[in-house]
Amino acid sequence: MSTFIGQLVGFAAIVFLVVRYVVPPVRRLMAARQEAVRQQLQDAAAAADRLTESTTAHSKAVEAAKAESKRVVDEAQADAKRITEQLAAQAGLEAERIKSQGSRQVDLLRTQLTRQLRLELGHEAVRQAGELVRNYVADPAQQSATVDRFLDDLDAMAPAAADVQYPLMTKMRSSSRVALVNLTERFTTVAKDLDNKALSALSSELVSVAQMLDREIVVTRYLTVPAEDAGPRVRLIERLLSGKVGDVTLEVLRAAVSERWSANSDLIDALEHLSRQALLEVAERENKVDEVEEQLFRFSRILDVQPRLAILLGDYAVPVEGRVGLLRKVLDSASITVNPIVAALLTQTVELLRGRPAEEAVQFLAEVAVARRGEVVAQVSAAADLSGAQRSRLTEVLSRIYGHPVSVQLQIDTELLGGLLIAVADEVIDGTLASRLAAAEAQLPD
């Protein structure tokens, strides 16, 4: 019995403990769980409501999208139809424009091709003509015949004489021309009483005075003042040069400054001219005039074909002594013996270039040498050497044309093909076959 009571008390204690300490937490836990389940049920109900709402909204959006897409498609179809019509209209206009422009381009291209074809045919015709001419004149007899035909044409020009003035005169105005004539007459009177040595000394002193006047511009300007009384000019030249040059030179200088000169440089030109005349007088007395003329023209042609040498001789950055030294080296290396008078004339020319190109100054010197004998210089270029008869006929015809004896200076240029090229002073007569071919080519259309 006591055991039962003990068990009952133990059971009661256990029940008390369970009710006291276990049941409250379990109740709270169950209540919390129930609350959580209830909240979940509420959330599920809300989610179901939202799902229903979203489904409804989705359906509405789908319907609206279908309606909008149908509207956009309808508008796009309308726009596409309108654009298609516009493009079709523009394409028609563009096609007409392209067709018109293409037609113009075709016409322009046809014109250009026609012009180019004509030009090519023209050049080919000229080239073929040139070949025919070259083959024709390859025969020396036929080439000589071209010269004879040109001389026939030139002979027909003989009645029409041309007025050709001598060198230096063409550069001066009337007052200086008169002064040069008077001074030359005075020089001739003085020179006839001098021997060759005195003439050479006179030439050298005149060149020295000309160089001095070229440097002293103020003195030259005073000596050429166009005053009626020449006394002051004569006294000045005497004070400057008395005792420094010979009496003959001083006499010539007195005569020079007594004249009226149109330009300051004309006095220097006149002194240079007289210095050349003195040396040419020596050549004439020694019967060396032809040799002097030939060598001067030969040196002139050398400068024409060797422009580098002409540039060096006229390089004013180099002292005159250096340029004269170069000239002497060239003359010493010549294949022929250079006449001393030619060397002196060329040296004086280099010393008194005064801004002129060397090749022009030497050519002018050669013309002065020929003009001393009253001859006119004719520079003649031919494709081959002339026969004696042709040279004589050419000289005779040119002498009749210009009314003066003519000195023919011949130069060979095979590029001329045939005929002759004649230059007298500033007048040029071109009767070469090469010039005719060039003229034919120049007349071709561009």
Swiss-Prot record:
One of its GO terms (molecular function) is proton-transporting ATP synthase activity, rotational mechanism. Residues 169-446 are annotated as: ATP synthase subunit delta. The keyword Transmembrane helix applies. It holds the Pfam family OSCP. It is found in: Cell membrane. Its main location: membrane. The keyword Disulfide bond does not apply. This is ATP synthase subunit b-delta. The gene is atpFH.
